Amino acid sequence: SDVAGYDLLEPLADLDYVKSQGINGPIFALIALDSHDYEIPKAVAGKTQTTREALIDAILAAQLSDGGWNVNGNGADADMTAMAIQALAPYYSSNAKVKSAVDDALKRLSKMQEVNGGYTSWGTANAESVAQVIVALTSLGIDPASDGRFIKNGYSTLDALATFYNDKGGFKHSQSDTTSSNGLATEQAYYALASWYRLKAGKTSLYDMSDVTTMSKIIEKTVVNGGDSAKDPKKDTLASGSSLAASGTTRSITKKATIKLGKMTEAAKAALD
């Protein structure tokens, strides 16, 4: 709510403004608000108040008869269908309408999956579409490496994503991409891998930041050690797997987590390293 003095939540209070861009608006507004259970600010006079219910209703209303979503409303698109699932995932277990919509969307994504485990959007098989599906599945607790609905001819979405990886540490947009790495593809591929890692490590989903310790809480828990830290170390536990080590004004936060990787291509493993 305070980024260089700017309240990022304030524009999201105006429902009409949020919806003006299209279905992307309600989807990512809901994701943003739910990322840390933010309270929606009061809309200014004359504006339509945003509520979580209104955002959910807008997303559900845009679902197509084939079970998916698309920006232009003409047939399910893998990216938009996956993004809609990501936004609705927190309500899957508590809202019957959401559950029904998401179940239909999962069926559509399963049918849309290519024989190599990948996805095509706007006529092109690409890394970003695969990445969005991975994030959608993990947001529901579905392991894309093992769920049979999303494995075609032995290939999972993770296998498909790995085919876009290059030896420079990045990802290309499509197989015909002549650039060494594509910025958007690399960004989305890595946060998709992060979402899978978080699932395997038993952590919250990618956009669920309820496990984040805010700086104010860290400061409140800080233990200032005025003695010899080598002889008299002090630690203040912040959360499971995290510790705040204090020695005078030097402090560090360390987090460690390990997962056992399932069967996947070497390229996908390398991308996680």
Can you describe what each PLM-predicted range is?
Residues 100, 158, 270-271:
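Extracellular cell-wall/glycan-interacting regions and their flexible linkers
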Residues 1-3, 17-48, 52, 57, ...:
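An alpha-helical repeat/solenoid feature that recognizes helix-turn-helix modules
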Residues 160, 177-239, 245:
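Terminal, non-catalytic domain-edge segments
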Residues 152-156:
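Extended intrinsically disordered, low-complexity coil regions enriched in Ser, Thr, Gly, Ala
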Residues 223-272:
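Solvent-exposed, low-complexity, repeat-rich "mucin-like" stalks and linkers
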Residues 159-166:
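Acidic helix/loop microenvironments that form the catalytic cleft of cell-wall polysaccharide enzymes
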Residues 8-17:
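Eukaryotic RNA-binding helical-repeat scaffolds
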